[in-house]
Amino acid sequence: MVLEFIGADREVTGSCHYLTFGDTHVLIDCGMEQGADLYVNQEIPVNPSLIDYVFVTHAHIDHSGLLPLIYNHGFRGTIFATKATTDLCNIMLKDSAHIQEFEAEWKNRKARRAGRPEVTPMYNVEDAQNVMQHFTPCDYNSVYEICPGLKVRFVDAGHLLGSSSIEMWVTEENVTKKIVFSGDIGNHNRPLIKDPQYVDSADYVVMESTYGNRLHDTPPDYAVELAKVINATFTRGGNLVIPAFSVGRTQEMLYFIRRIKTENLLPEHPNFEVYIDSPLAVEATNVFHENISDCFDEEAMELISAGINPIKFPGLRVAVSSDESKMINFDKKPKVIISASGMCEAGRIRHHLKHNLWRSDSTVLFVGYQVPGTLGYALLNGAKKVKLFGEEIEVRASIVNLPGISGHADKNQLTEWLGAIKNKPEHVFIVHGEESTAEYFANHVHETFSYDAVAPYSGDAYDLITNQKVADGSRKRVEKKASYGMASREKTIFDRLVAAGQRLVSVIQKCQGMANKDLSKFADQINALCDKWDR
C-alpha cells in the first residue's frame, strides 16, 4: 500500500496522487499544471492503460485537465466524481481541448512561416468527449465499494459546485488504512454553495494549503458594493463590463445582481439588463440549475422553496452565438455585460473591451485575481493604452476592482478543518501550495497538533502500512517549463521584457566616464523609447 506524490507538491497546480495496493492502480485527481513551475514533476509511474480508477475532487482544470491526455495514452478505467463535477467536467474538458487545438494551430502558423516542424495539441476534443464516457457519478455521503479492498465516500468541500473531499478506506494484507484527500477546501459563507463538510477520522491526510499562511479580510456586502458601481456607471450613461471566470464567479455575480434587483438596492435604475456573453458560462449556469438539491446551501434552498431562482432574474439575457454577442454592442442602453475570460486574455470579453474601454462613461469591473503579464493586470494597474485586435485603444473607462470572494479556506479555516479529525493521524501531507506556504503550514500543523506533517516533493512515496518513506522524489528545480494557456505565454514574454530592462540598467552603469556628448545621445534614445511605450 504505497502513496506516491505526483503533482501540486510544493506548487499550486497540477494536482495528482498515485496510490497502489495489491494489483490495483489508482489516481486521485489528474490535473494540468498552469503557470510557472518550480520543480520537475514525477511522471505517473505506470502506463495509463494500467490505471484502474481515477477519483476527481472537483472540475477545475488544475485537478482534472489531464484526463483527456491519459485517455489518449491508453487509459480505459473508471473515473469517479460527484454528479456536479461530472457535469462540469463535460463542458470544461471540451473547452480545454478547444484551447489546446487553438494554441497548437497558432504555433503551427508561426512554425510553417519559419520552416520549423509543426506541433500536435496535447489532446483534442475527441479525447475529451471519449474520456467522459468513463465517468461514474457519485452521491455525497454515500460509501461506495469500488473493488475488493477499496471503499470511498465523497463529502462536500465547499470550494466549487460539486467539489469534494474524498475519504478512502484501503485494505491490504488484512490491514485497513483510511486516507483522506482534502481536495480544495472552500472559504466559508460563500453564495450558493455549502460550507465545507468536516471529516472526523483519518489515518493519513493529504491536505491543500493554498492560503495556509494568510487570513482573509472581513468581506464587505458585495451586493451593496456592486450596486454602487452599477449606479455610478449608469448615471454616466455607460456600460458595466465584468470580466469573470465562466464557472463559479459568473454565477456569484448573478446571485449578487438578483439581490440588487429583489432588494431594490438600485432604485434609480430598477429594470437594467444583464448579458452573459460566454457560451461556457451559459453551460455552467445550466449545470448549477441541474444540481440545486445536492450542492446549494440553506439560504439558496430557502429561496428555491419560495419559488425564487437565486441566479435568475428579470432582465437576464444570454448570448450563445457570435451574432448574439455582436448585437450586445449595438444596444445603446446602459447594461451589465459579464463575459470571459476573467483575465481578458481570450474570449468575447476582448470585443466588449474594444467597444467600451475608450468610453469615459463606461466601467470595467474586476472581480478576481489578475496574473501579472495579462491584459487584465495591465488595465488594473493603470495602463493608458492597450492593443486589441491590432488596434490601439485609449483607456478612458473607469477601472474598478471589487476584490473577489476567495474560493479557498484561509489558515484558520484549514486549521479548523483538520482539527475536526478526532484521532491522531499517522501522517499529514501538505500539498497544493507554494513552497514557502506548504512548508509554513506543515510546521503550523506540527506545532498546533503535534502531528507528523510534511510538505512532500513530487516523487516522494510512503508505505502506508508501515508509515515509512520508501522513495525520495527529485529535488531538481526548473527555471522555465512548458505551460499551457495564453496567460502563461504572456507572462513569459513579460519576463523577457523585465530582463531586457535589467540589461539596460547594467549598460547604463557601464557608461559612466563616457563623453558627455555620447551620454546625452544615449539618454535621448532611452527617453524616445520610453515616450513610445509609456501608455
Regions found by a protein language model. Give the residues of each.
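His/Asp/Glu-rich metal-coordinating catalytic cores
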Residues: M1-F55, H60, S64, L69-E252, ...
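Conserved acidic residues
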Residues: D52, D203, K335, S362, ...
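Short, surface-exposed amphipathic charged segments that create phosphate/polyanion-binding patches used
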Residues: L150-F154, V287-C295, T415-E416, I465-V478
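Short, compositionally biased "basic patch" segments
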Residues: P191-V206, I292-E299, Q370-R396
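Hard-cation-handling environments
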Residues: V229-L375, V386-K387, K422, T437, ...
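C-terminal, active-site-flanking charged/polar segments
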Residues: R359, E434-E479
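Generic long, charged, amphipathic alpha-helical segments
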Residues: K387-L418
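Charged, amphipathic alpha-helical linkers/stalks
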Residues: G459-K521
